[in-house]
């Protein structure tokens, strides 16, 4: 099967923003106007096509990135297509802070992005986070200032905020006509034409007019600024401009495209997706200014097993190159089983092909291959460079793995995922639930690398760990709905850690004799605290066979098991080095198990000799509040052991930044609502681990030990 659409007509992009900026509503309009959806779904009535999980429809937020393939013919008058069809692969991403990992995974495989802003709120905290993520992946973007029909919407304030908050250079290519209830449409500053939506046909048609006299001066001023920015992208254009010759419309579009792809500036558009105004010109903006796979530099990968990760193997958007792709999301489908969303960077892949998972060194075979539309599928037999497809039935491949031609192996990416900061105990109600829960948790963990499942060795409880309360709520809900698990759920707990405060030398002997073969192992270990983030390091400095080589793995295993159960309160001990310096063995009574038990015993002695400390997650909290409540908010944050970092004006409100222990942030949302009469909002992100004050640590240890 030959490629149907040339690569220059592909656009792989995501719609990203802060929660409630209107992402899913905008995507619904896109699907409607591109003909993928026959009616418009609304988030507030639970009918949105992209929000396909039940919890998403109930909560009105998007949790997982749903991928959709659709097509767009660039148009200006609403009836005549000005170009052949463009193929859009769209990822709709969540804006809630607990699901930042989904955004991260999406950005790793996209070529461009549409950033949505709420016309009233402007650049919000999660927008800044996502913007920084997009900067890290060098993703060109355009901005759509949405909700221009809302009370208090201010396009020019949003433009100023983009400059102040993100450091980017905004390049408005539109200017709104009216705002709030008076929003009519916008002026296209490239063509100097008004686009006005008047009819009752769900925004499917609009009227093009010359710019009205009352707005002409402002529009001309803004266009002049746009042209000045654009001509800087080309020496010849700049020279002509200085001689008094402005670029014509196609040349101006080409210059804006060049600047956008080079990340020199960001085109700004405006409208209201909910009121069906401005969505089609935004789609034209995707065509005009966002990259095709051909505009993106070749992806540089490295040879599997190369510890230096020297990136010298190029893979570019070319069907003739060896096949290479990146698995960026796992999803469980009730009919097709496990679906692995994959971005194909080079070459092509056919149904039945065998390929290599270069990350794990395992062979896989393509069973079924589908093109996704939210949670509906179109089965296909072949996929090409630039495609985003879902592969069914892969056994070994998980998020972040590279899949490639076995004859030309390459690793494209090593994704890193954050450590969970909150945990909850979950107990199945019956034996049947136990089995279902085990399967369910395994599948959910495969889908979401920021979710971990562990067993507490002492209590036997299953512990779920995640990025926030909402994150775990959703997963527990999915256990009930998708896997029919009935379980008792504990209270959310903070994921504390422990560390040692000073170096210690420990000499420990394990000896057991009770008839028959005994057990004997003696080890000398030096324990040292390390910098935060170093993890656990084991070093063998044995010389002369004091401990035979075959027993040393037993020492490491014993330490690895013991550190998970802690020294003070049962929390994992991290950031330390254990060096095995000496020991002794018995020809008959020594074994790997004996050395493992000795290592556990030696580790326990750190409680008295290593000055263990309790560590807690510290969250970066931002509260945006009307000034009237600022004193109360700061006082309340201080009472939660918060450290105020600073404050700044945010429109008519004030944004306060603080570092606060996570343990003191449970239930904060209702407290803040009461304190500010519902007018203040907050966001919080994990920042770092810090030592718990001694008095607080003592209380936690007593609670855990029940004394």
From Swiss-Prot:
Domain of life: Bacteria
Disulphide-bonded residues: none
Cellular compartments annotated: Cytoplasm
GO molecular function per UniProt: GTP binding; GTPase activity; translation elongation factor activity
Keyword Hydrolase: no
Coiled-coil positions: none
Amino-acid biosynthesis recorded as keyword: no
InterPro entries listed in its UniProt record: EF-G-like_DII, EFG_II, EFG_III, EFG_III/V, EFG_IV, EFG_V, EFG_V-like, G_TR_CS
GO biological process, one term: ribosome disassembly
Keywords noted in UniProt: Cytoplasm, Elongation factor, GTP-binding, Nucleotide-binding, Protein biosynthesis
Binding site for GTP: 17-24, 92-96, 146-149
Segments traversing the membrane: none
A Pfam family: EF-G_D2
GO cellular component, one term: cytoplasm
Family as reported in the entry's similarity comment: Belongs to the TRAFAC class translation factor GTPase superfamily. Classic translation factor GTPase family. EF-G/EF-2 subfamily.
Primary role: Catalyzes the GTP-dependent ribosomal translocation step during translation elongation. During this step, the ribosome changes from the pre-translocational (PRE) to the post-translocational (POST) state as the newly formed A-site-bound peptidyl-tRNA and P-site-bound deacylated tRNA move to the P and E sites, respectively. Catalyzes the coordinated movement of the two tRNA molecules, the mRNA and conformational changes in the ribosome.
Protein name: Elongation factor G
Species this protein is from: Hyphomonas neptunium (strain ATCC 15444)
Source taxonomy: Bacteria, Pseudomonadati, Pseudomonadota, Alphaproteobacteria, Hyphomonadales
Gene (UniProt): fusA
